[in-house]
Amino acid sequence: MEIKTEIEINASAENVWKVLVNFPDYGSWNPVITKINGMPYVGEKISFNIKAAPGIEVPIPLCEILVASAASKELRWKGPAIPIASDVLSGEHYFIVQEMAPNKVRFVHGEDFTGLAAGALKPLLQDRLTDSYNEMNRALKAR
């Protein structure tokens, strides 16, 4: 199951990238991923909090950074890094900043889900996560 969203942002690719990899600042602008512990380096283990509903934050443990490329402006992480849990449901979350013009980018934000429960959870997750990712995209654009 894949969830994929896009938004055009009137900013340079470099500026959008700087916001994405500034994990300590997520709580000040991101309404969905409200906190990230760790650094944006390949192989680094991160954990983060997501806002599941008003007043409800869910901790997501032990995701591994797979790609963190300033050159291609791509950030990906996969989790959870718990072997039994990843057989049931695992997601590869991604952000890609595509330069369209000097001060205009396409921000691609999505997640590929795999595991035994991925298909069964699609009706529950598809619309909710698409809405959440679009909410984050709009907040990034406003930043």
Task: Please tell me what each predicted stretch does.
Residues 81-135, 140:
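Beta-strand/loop substructures that line and gate deep hydrophobic ligand-binding cavities in soluble
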Residues 29-31, 58-59, 88-90:
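Short solvent-exposed loop/turn micro-motifs enriched in small/polar/acidic residues
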Residues 37-86, 138-143:
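Glycine-rich portal/gate segments that line the openings of hydrophobic small-molecule binding cavities
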